[in-house]
Amino acid sequence: MSAVRLKKKYEKLVLELRYLTADYDYHRLVYGTAQKRFEESFEHWRIEQGLLTPAEARAVQGVVPKEEFTDVVTIEEDENTKKRIEKVATILFKKIAKATHPDKLLHLSEEERATRLQMFIEARKASSRREWYRLLCIATDLAISLPIPTKEHITLLESKNSELRDTIQYMEKTYVWVYDQMPNEESKHRLFKEFASVIGYVPVK
């Protein structure tokens, strides 16, 4: 792959990463609030219907935990790859810290300074969690020059984008997410009935 083509593909993947990361964060937020409503509403409906939990009825093998989506899985890297990623992440974090340092923000408005401070906090959190892809997004937002792309960078970005995309799609297929999109109580109760059947809730005898 030519250097020009590699650079353009890298830029494309970074843009996709920024969108997917924002979309993933949005889905996590929506899922988190919807899960609480789902659990409370289902428990109320279950009691009204006189259903026992699988554990109470001892009608299934084992106990089925509450439905949860699988979080983004960390890419399995060999030691050399990990070291290279950590080196790039460290460089990016230092550049972000420099760009968001209070001494560099004196010419900005109070609102802009607050935004930069929040970006630094997010970058520090991402750095401690080894979430290099979030550092990449923050660096892009700050117009910080990114590392010269390599084929390895392309592969890592493609893998991370795929993981984010798969996680988002999985969340959208969960009962919690579908419940949150239901237009009325009747459709929600139909969903509860299906959920109860799949998980193994049974009527009181």
Give, region by region, the residue ranges found by the protein language model:
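C-terminal accessory/regulatory regions appended to core domains
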Residues: M1-K205
